[in-house]
């Protein structure tokens, strides 16, 4: 998958120079590219309201981050559960109309979740960094900021709002960007969860130092098709290196039944990230119990 960071104009050659500048009317090739383009503009607006310097000053007074990886390794369930606080998605639209992030988060904790994931994207998932802050005030377990991270600014903002871990999506980041952002995350005492969708992306991530937690997304972000075989195939293909490096694997997307959970567990997943199948239930606590009945 190729992600262009900004919609380009056709290249223009002037003498021996070749110019290519952003085209505000360019069309994205797929939803992930559209999201990344939107993030470019969104972060620019955020910086206008609050500078990175001022944001970093706020971060210095934030409480220490909680041990996200430790919570997974000592999971209350097997595999460990990262339960997602999620109102909507591009593929499903609004998942829960009566969306109360704090109540949902508390129900997840009661059900035995080891960690929570909170969507902060507003345009495509109807989340917010304010929701992250509200959940942080209400629960004590570690929190993952589920965002499309392309700039350090977003990482500092997530830390200020209470995140203990940050999602990094390999598909939208160059290797050099991944390395740089991972270094920043570690420097703030947080855990990077690096998400992959293919064997090529997994190989890229395994070549980077500082990676201890890898998420395998079973959803094809171009077609939205879901296959749990993605988790099985990727773990099988690189199981020796994963074991040797002591890397924890999180299976993400498409887990709706005890049979699904059993499949990814037997494949070798240490944890699962589940949102839709829990958040749409009237009683998320009971939904967790039902799901882990395999």
UniProtKB/Swiss-Prot annotation:
Pathway where it operates: Amino-acid biosynthesis; L-tryptophan biosynthesis; L-tryptophan from chorismate: step 4/5
MF annotations from Gene Ontology: indole-3-glycerol-phosphate synthase activity; phosphoribosylanthranilate isomerase activity
Coiled coil: none
Catalytic reaction equation(s): 1-(2-carboxyphenylamino)-1-deoxy-D-ribulose 5-phosphate + H(+) = (1S,2R)-1-C-(indol-3-yl)glycerol 3-phosphate + CO2 + H2O
An example Gene Ontology biological process: L-tryptophan biosynthetic process
Top class in the EC scheme: lyase
Protein's UniProt keywords contain Amino-acid biosynthesis: yes
Pfam families recorded: IGPS
CDD domains the UniProt entry points to: IGPS
Family annotation (PROSITE patterns): IGPS (PS00614)
Keywords, in A-Z order: Amino-acid biosynthesis, Aromatic amino acid biosynthesis, Decarboxylase, Lyase, Tryptophan biosynthesis
E.C. number: 4.1.1.48
InterPro entries: Aldolase_TIM, Indole-3-glycerol_P_synth, Indole-3-glycerol_P_synth_dom, Indole-3-GlycerolPSynthase_CS, RibuloseP-bd_barrel
The family this protein is said to belong to: Belongs to the TrpC family.
Record-linked HAMAP family: IGPS_B (MF_00134_B)
Protein name: Indole-3-glycerol phosphate synthase
